[in-house]
Amino acid sequence: HRLSSAASDVYKRQLHKKINEVSKKYLEPHGDGYQLHFTSAVCIGPGESKQILHRDRGIWGGYLPRKVEPLMSTIWAITEFTKANGATQVVPGSHKWDKDRIPTEKEIAYAEMKPGSVLLYTGTVLHGGGQNETIDESRTGVFLHYALNWLRQEENQYLSCPPDVAKDLSPEIRSLIGYSKGGYVLGFYSDPHDKTATYESVSPENMFKDHLIDDFSSYQTQQN
């Protein structure tokens, strides 16, 4: 987790043009924008058992109407993905299934891919990490998921990437993380440094402007 504050190659993946075009196509019919939902690097080592098949939309329980697609998930291959070393199991077409339908083995595909490749699937598609049957080969992937900006993020981006870290990122990355407003006032903040209450419904991006905040010491994460 905490990849939003990690490295420049992660930023490039987060802002990848094609990924964001696909995310916009599938998500924006259900809202006026999307945000980074979850970041993680996952390594499946030799002998690891397969993950239970699941839908990522389950993070919000069963409260969202099925017709609403809340999530676009991506897995970037850092190492080669093979069926033998735990390539992700995916069930094509399962986004249209009844939620209780169980796939047969023949209906499960494996996302075998070379390093640098990326798997995309919506939050309604059944999937899960594969079993690593090798004795000396690990499978590593970077997970970057995007969700509608009116839903709570699975990873608390504002703790994983607090303002004193986010100030060094590009405005595009900050906006994707959630340092921005959705719709008219969703996600606004009250500036604790504005003693006169001059500004109302302030966009979080404003906190990175010098005329509002010059010192981020009050936002820094305390070390134990």
Report residues per predicted region.
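Single conserved hydrophobic/aromatic residue that forms the stacking wall/gate
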Residues: 1-7, 11
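Amphipathic alpha-helical segments that form well-ordered structural scaffolds
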Residues: 18-26
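A short coil-to-beta-strand element that immediately follows conserved catalytic motifs
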Residues: 29-39
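Short Ser/Thr-interspersed hydrophobic loop/turn segments at strand-loop and sheet-helix junctions
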Residues: 42, 80-81, 124-125
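Conserved double-stranded beta-helix
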Residues: 101-120, 125, 130-224
